[in-house]
Amino acid sequence: IAISPENLKISERAVICMPYHKLLDCYEEDRLADAKYGSTRRGIAPVYGDKYMKKALRMGDLFHPETTKARLADIVAYKNLTIEGVYGRPPVSADDMWAWLVEYGDILKPYICDAGLYLDKAAKAGKNILFEAQLGALRDIDFGIYPYTSSSNVIGAYAPVGAGIPNHKIDRNIGIMKAYSSCVGEGPFTCELFGEEAEKLRAAGGEYGADRKSV
């Protein structure tokens, strides 16, 4: 299937994961050492933190380069306080971050849309809409085994919030239950299996992390 703006849409409200988010993710995991959370080191926790600190950029900002460039410079100065002061690492260049944002932003701009409006039109046209949650309920930031969770809500109740549509539009919820439990990362794991029994299930079910091929 060819990927085009006709079949792939990116919400204008989606927060952009910048290179410094990945750096901060790695620096913190390295600092924690044996007490680490088992992050994928993709910058997910730092970018969610910035979202709620109002220190993040969103996809829609790409259409306003002048204000976005100025805001990025302020954000980078703020992030460097942590990068240099806490982790003792070299500062990030605002110019480099802007060049990165422009390069990839130009590629992605055609895909950006008002996702809520797009889905509302689809619903009114009688189309079927499927929302798929990633990860299991125990990785949910609110209902999971905190702090060994993802950084967002992954349960079905959050689907209309993230999509920007009224919750009464959701007319069916489908829960998936596995015959055995599995998880990636650090932290407690209820009913964890070990030894030969675990290895057989892992191999038979392909139970490896999609990001790092972790077990």
Regions found by a protein language model. Give the residues of each.
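Non-transmembrane, aqueous-exposed alpha-helical and coiled segments at domain scale
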Residues: 1-214
